[in-house]
């Protein structure tokens, strides 16, 4: 076997092994997307009813709360960026990071200081490489987030917005995450999470023509709001974590499918080259045999004379 043919066969074996790996990763990502979508659907009724309850308390009373009160002058903002712990997801992380940087630039242009909170190792690696300050970091759960993870993330953020800016607090909280639209479309978006605009929440939760019930609050509207608002923030962060997880798995599936298809095309190309090399080798051997036979025939004819 010629040296060139051996090289082609070795490359075909290597690419075939890679194709098997990418195909397996594609199938795993596809199953995880389905699980993440189910979790989003399962959490929706709870989030909807919680939103209605918060709206009822906020709009049905004159209660003021730190999480719903807009500062007269906003001097410091917090940005929560949701990325993944792992790569191999195409432009998933880079799009989220780009959206966060654009939001940060916009807030700084308005004269605000920005504290950055990050979920996921990929986002942390980006900021650490550029020596940018990260106020707090959470990792290890981005593939399959739970409500407990959302609660862990929400705690420091709620504490920060309840503090005065002079004591290290912030005036508002923005979140940047990737919204799952479909298996083929995922969009990095930013949204202001706190302080909560009760009017916007009421519009989101209301159905046209719906008659809203009247509520009595015990022991008081203030106590109910104190209990509900942190749960509302946790549910919003949990939904964003689930959306990001589904988007990441969809991006991984798409990237691995592309890699599998490219590997198949490369195997076909290498197979054609290997066949051409084999044919050239066979042709060379036949030429050598014919040439040798011809020379032998000429030598035999000469000796007969």
Swiss-Prot record:
One of its GO terms (cellular component) is proton-transporting ATP synthase complex. Keywords: ATP synthesis, Cell membrane, CF(1), Hydrogen ion transport, Ion transport, Membrane, Transport. It is a peripheral membrane protein. GO terms for biological process: proton motive force-driven plasma membrane ATP synthesis. It is found in: Cell membrane. InterPro entries: ATP_synth_F1_ATPase_gsu, ATP_synth_F1_gsu, ATP_synth_F1_gsu_CS. Signal peptide: none annotated. GO terms for molecular function: ATP binding; proton-transporting ATP synthase activity, rotational mechanism. The keyword Transmembrane does not apply. It comes from the Bacteria. F-type ATPases have 2 components, CF(1) - the catalytic core - and CF(0) - the membrane proton channel. CF(1) has five subunits: alpha(3), beta(3), gamma(1), delta(1), epsilon(1). CF(0) has three main subunits: a, b and c. HAMAP family: ATP_synth_gamma_bact (MF_00815). Produces ATP from ADP in the presence of a proton gradient across the membrane. The gamma chain is believed to be important in regulating ATPase activity and the flow of protons through the CF(0) complex. Belongs to the ATPase gamma chain family. This is ATP synthase gamma chain. The lineage of its organism: Bacteria, Bacillati, Actinomycetota, Actinomycetes, Kitasatosporales. The gene is atpG.
